[in-house]
């Protein structure tokens, strides 16, 4: 666990509530004149290990960014390199490795994935400047379940890849590339006429709308499979960790199945969907979400497949039924 340390006296009180699920601590923003052994003593008193620390340095500061999320760029790499150099002196990498052992995946799930892997499906996966927010673990799980990943660019390519069975539109910044996406009319038409299962998360969902706004509030033509408009607001909309329950069967979920997810966006839609019901982790808010009809599953929630492999089992069952028709 990484902990910012503003005042040494507050460290023990803060860590106290995490001792049942945290084994080791890395302390961040340490003042240069602080006694590291004193920090180590306070951490050890709680039965935890101090495996590293990072001194406060203005060179490590990262400016605020749209959504708080960063795509690869030169200045970020420079900061990362500086932090890496410092951590090479202050972080016990052996202890970090020892405390970071990954829990083995469920054997039954792994066996089932191997059995399914014999059935190959080609999945077009959007990945470019506008669509770059995805869990790499999702790619791994998709491949385990027999999907051949074919990456493509909604900005630069003229149409979808050939002979694909599924389309996955990941999250990203379509609003920052609205003009480029909208002007690529051949791609819009290719997606609209694809007639294959389409999964769209957040940014991908925005792109599927009949129209969507850019960051300046200008409206642009979208794919048109979601009959509404995605528009910018002045604050975060329905953000946080949530649990989603399906209201009926769809290409990814069956009625009453549940998954955990999250939403994090400044955009809203005139067509958010009511296929599923979402409840925040702290039970403070709840709302309807996701458009799921025919062969579409699209909404603001981000999907994480590891642990929810039944989503792919449902998708494969749908593909098999379509093949038999």
Question: Which residues make up each language-model segment?
Answer:
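Inter-motif core of Ras-like GTPase G domains
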Residues: 1-3
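Internal gly/pro-rich beta-alpha loop/helix module
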Residues: 5-113
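Short, solvent-exposed amphipathic alpha-helical segments in soluble enzyme
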Residues: 13-16, 40-44, 138-147, 315-316
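Structural motif
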Residues: 26, 168-170, 298-300
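Residue-level signal for short, function-critical loop segments
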Residues: 29, 127-129, 229, 303-304
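C-terminal and late-domain segments of enzyme folds
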Residues: 90, 118, 131-141, 232, ...
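Phosphate-binding active sites in nucleotide-utilizing proteins
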Residues: 119-183, 187-193
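Cysteine-nucleophile active-site neighborhood
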Residues: 174-250
């Amino acid at each position: 666990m990484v902990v910012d340390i503003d005042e040494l006296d507050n460290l023990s009180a803060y860590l106290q509530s995490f001792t049942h699920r945290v084994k080791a601590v890395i302390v961040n923003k340490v003042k240069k004149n602080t006694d590291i052994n004193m920090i180590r003593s306070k951490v050890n008193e709680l039965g935890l290990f101090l495996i590293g620390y990072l001194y406060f340095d203005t060179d490590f500061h990262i400016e605020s960014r749209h959504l708080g999320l960063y795509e690869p760029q030169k200045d970020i790499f420079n900061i990362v390199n500086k932090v890496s150099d410092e951590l090479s002196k202050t972080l016990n990498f052996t202890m970090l490795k020892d405390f970071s052992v990954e829990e083995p995946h469920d054997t039954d799930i792994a066996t089932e994935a191997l059995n399914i892997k014999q059935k190959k499906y080609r999945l077009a996966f959007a990945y470019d400047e506008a669509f770059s927010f995805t869990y790499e673990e999702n790619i791994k799980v998709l491949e385990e379940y027999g999907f051949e990943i074919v990456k493509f660019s909604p900005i630069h390519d003229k149409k979808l890849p050939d002979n694909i069975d599924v389309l996955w539109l990941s999250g990203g910044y379509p609003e920052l590339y609205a003009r480029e996406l909208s002007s690529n009319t051949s791609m819009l038409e290719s997606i609209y006429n694809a007639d294959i299962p389409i999964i769209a998360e957040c940014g991908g969902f925005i792109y599927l709308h009949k129209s969507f706004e850019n960051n300046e509030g200008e409206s642009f033509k979208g794919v048109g499979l979601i009959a509404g408009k995605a528009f910018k607001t002045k604050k975060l909309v329905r953000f946080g960790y949530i649990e989603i329950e399906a209201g009926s069967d769809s290409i990814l979920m069956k009625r009453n199945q549940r998954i955990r997810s999250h939403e994090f966006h400044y955009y809203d839609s005139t067509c958010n969907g009511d296929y599923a019901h979402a409840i925040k982790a702290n039970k403070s808010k709840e709302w309807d979400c996701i458009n799921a009809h025919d062969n579409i599953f699209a909404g603001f929630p981000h999907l994480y497949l590891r642990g929810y492999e039944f989503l792919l089992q449902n998708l494969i069952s749908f593909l098999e039924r379509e093949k038999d028709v």
